[in-house]
Regions:
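Binding-site signature for planar aromatic cofactors or substrates
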Residues: 1-188
Length: 188
């Protein structure tokens, strides 16, 4: 589920919230999954991956990740991203273009402290996108981390939030006979 904090009253945000509720009412699975595409300057290619959108606060759309991951270095070197959401339950696609940046340490700390112990152990123990010998190694690291964690275990500095602020929205809704609706909002 996405948490809406101080939702922006501009039209694309209100439209998104309305579609989100409609998709939720229609049983959309994985409703918080969004595809974020970034540019890999080293390989001169675009890469996409799914992340879980956690918050929309004013103009900021926020998810959390490992700051040592390949996507993190891509965000650092090229802050332009493209976002895609598809909700099959209402045949709706939402595209966004945005600039991305890290959230404050305080916001990341607050979110980390509100998560389950297991999720935090995974964030701490995961060597995201690194080559490993086997999945057994992942499970071992996770279980060892879980055993030593306490409620006071702090957020690791290599894990935290990312926030993007869309300047372009495209809402596409499929209809019969390909008579589809498309609404575009762009900040000029």
């Amino acid at each position: 589920m996405i948490k809406f904090l101080n939702i922006n009253s501009e039209k694309p945000y209100i439209h998104f919230q309305s579609l989100y509720q409609e998709a939720l009412d229609n049983g959309q699975k994985g409703i918080e999954a969004i595809s974020v595409s970034s540019y890999n300057q080293i390989k001169n290619e675009v890469e996409a991956r799914y992340v879980n959108l956690k918050y929309i606060s004013n103009n900021d759309w926020i998810f959390f990740s490992n700051y040592n991951s390949p996507k993190a270095s891509q965000f650092e070197s090229h802050s332009q991203v493209s976002i895609l959401i598809f909700w099959a339950s209402i045949n709706t696609q939402i595209r966004m273009k945005a600039k991305i940046f890290k959230t404050s340490d305080e916001f990341s700390d607050e979110h980390f402290q509100g998560r389950t112990r297991e999720k935090n152990a995974l964030a701490i123990s995961s060597n995201q996108s690194q080559i490993i010998n086997s999945f057994d190694e992942v499970e071992k690291n996770f279980n060892e981390t879980l055993q030593v964690m306490t409620p006071e275990t702090p957020r690791p500095n290599f894990w935290g939030g990312y926030s993007f602020t869309p300047y372009y929205f495209e809402f596409w809704q499929g209809h019969e006979n390909r008579l589809n609706k498309r609404h575009v909002f762009e900040q000029l």
